[in-house]
């Protein structure tokens, strides 16, 4: 069943073509500081289109015939932000021109999980940890079957990898997936700018024929607010989650001796969420974001899970309508985007945060017990607790800014969290939230 028309169409997030490029000659690096190309101006934004080509053999750490790794390379890329600043950098991965929203992530590890998190669709992820690529990548740590982010921004690209599970380098991984990346740029200065000014639209380009002013105009005219990004990351048809949960993933076993059938709405769901639910004894049916609530309820599930996902919850009214038709009928658990959709379905409002929460070190307080957990978070929007109807309880708050981080409505048999209890990457402090969902389904059977 097709979804109702959204407020705006989803952007094309992948490059249109890929081809080899020659290796760069040894040269002295160009300074990576910003320079201003024009005054800051406000204005509407429209969707930009990227054409990019894969890079071959020009990354930091290129291996030459004598087997020596040589990390030097010319600065061949630019990141132009909508505030007029231009940041020189060196490219790796794909080349071309790409537009997206620049956000920073404070996680020290887990870059592969971040790369494959669908919630980053349409965004450039800037890693505040300066050393990235040290452990390479492997097929086990992916959170989805592809990368949806616009690009990766890092300070230092490791010239070697060291991990027993590594199967390829970060450079090779991005080339195969046609994802742009830049390094040797002042990520700390960019992070400070985002912290002060908020998330900024940026254009990343290796195309030397484009002027800084042209790239700046692209950044100012691009739009992400009000765009339905979920339709570009959700699955095409329902399926049963059949991934065997290895002992390595089961850091806690035996949480429940009962089996529960859970229908999970895929708004950009992460694999480790499904693994954690499976570890708690759940049989999971995953359905697309636009799947009718009536068909889900006909399956007579023990519970319904609303997943994480990218973008603006106000841009997907069809998803809000689905949540409204399901809550109160079966136990419901929502994470991140699911939490925001539940808030809207209950009559509340959501708003865009200044620079969002992205990282694995956010303290949250459970107001019911006073317990403080360190959580993994990834969202640019939040629920306004003042807009919620009577009876809905705010159960958790983010201790950095006191924003709403959790909801509970016992009458409707629902709970939701603004952060990721599966924590991939991140600490496992909040894994007990899955146990709460299990208890809700168990009590509903009585």
Swiss-Prot record:
Skewed-composition ranges (Low complexity): 1-32
Disordered: annotated segments: 1-44
The UniProt record lists the keyword Cell membrane: no
Pathway: Amino-acid biosynthesis; L-arginine biosynthesis; carbamoyl phosphate from bicarbonate: step 1/1; Pyrimidine metabolism; UMP biosynthesis via de novo pathway; (S)-dihydroorotate from bicarbonate: step 1/3
Location of this chain's protein in the cell: Plastid, Chloroplast
NCBIfam families the UniProt entry points to: CPSaseIIsmall, PRK12838.1
Role noted for this protein: Small subunit of the arginine-specific carbamoyl phosphate synthase (CPSase). CPSase catalyzes the formation of carbamoyl phosphate from the ammonia moiety of glutamine, carbonate, and phosphate donated by ATP, the first step of the arginine biosynthetic pathway. The small subunit (glutamine amidotransferase) binds and cleaves glutamine to supply the large subunit with the substrate ammonia.
Protein name: Carbamoyl phosphate synthase small chain, chloroplastic
Organism: Oryza sativa subsp. japonica (Rice)
Phylogenetic placement of the source organism: Eukaryota, Viridiplantae, Streptophyta, Embryophyta, Tracheophyta
Protein's gene: CARA
């Amino acid at each position: 069943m097709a979804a109702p028309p959204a407020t705006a169409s989803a952007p094309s997030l992948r490059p249109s073509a890929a081809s080899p490029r020659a290796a760069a000659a040894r040269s002295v690096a160009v300074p990576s500081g910003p320079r201003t190309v024009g005054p800051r101006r406000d204005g509407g934004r429209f969707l930009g289109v990227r054409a990019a080509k894969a890079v071959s053999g020009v990354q930091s750490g290129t291996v030459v015939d004598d087997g020596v790794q040589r990390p030097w390379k010319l600065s061949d890329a630019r990141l132009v932000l909508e505030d007029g600043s231009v940041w020189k950098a060196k490219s790796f991965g794909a080349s071309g021109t790409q537009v997206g929203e620049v956000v920073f992530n404070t996680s020290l590890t887990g870059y592969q999980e971040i790369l494959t998190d669908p919630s980053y669709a349409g965004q450039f992820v800037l890693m505040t940890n300066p050393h990235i690529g040290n452990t390479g990548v492997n097929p086990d740590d992916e959170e989805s079957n592809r990368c949806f982010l616009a690009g990766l921004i890092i300070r230092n690209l490791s010239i070697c990898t060291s991990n027993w599970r590594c199967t390829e380098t970060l450079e090779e991984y991005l080339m195969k997936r046609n994802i742009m990346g830049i390094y040797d740029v002042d990520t700390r200065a960019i992070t400070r700018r985002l912290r002060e000014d908020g998330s900024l639209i940026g254009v990343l380009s290796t195309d030397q024929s484009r002027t800084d002013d042209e790239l700046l105009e692209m950044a100012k005219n691009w739009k992400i607010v009000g765009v339905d990004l979920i339709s570009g990351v959700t699955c095409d048809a329902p399926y049963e989650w059949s991934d065997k949960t290895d002992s390595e993933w089961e850091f806690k076993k035996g949480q429940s001796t009962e089996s529960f059938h859970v229908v999970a709405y895929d708004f950009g769901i992460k694999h480790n969420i499904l693994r954690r639910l499976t570890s708690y004894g759940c049989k999971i049916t995953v359905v697309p974001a636009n799947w009718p609530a009536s068909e889900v309820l006909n399956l007579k599930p023990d519970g319904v899970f609303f997943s994480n996902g990218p973008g603006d919850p106000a841009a997907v009214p069809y998803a809000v309508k689905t949540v409204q038709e399901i809550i109160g009928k079966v136990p419901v658990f929502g994470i991140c985007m699911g939490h925001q959709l539940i808030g809207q379905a209950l009559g509340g409002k959501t708003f865009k945060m200044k620079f969002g929460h992205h990282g694995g070190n956010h303290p949250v307080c459970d107001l019911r017990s006073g317990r403080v957990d360190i959580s993994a978070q990834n969202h640019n929007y939040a629920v306004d607790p003042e807009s919620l109807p009577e009876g809905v309880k705010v159960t958790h708050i983010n201790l950095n800014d006191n924003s709403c981080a959790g909801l509970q409505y016992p009458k409707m048999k629902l709970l939701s969290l603004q952060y990721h209890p599966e924590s991939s990457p991140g600490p496992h402090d909040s894994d007990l939230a899955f146990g709460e969902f299990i208890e809700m389904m168990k009590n509903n059977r009585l």
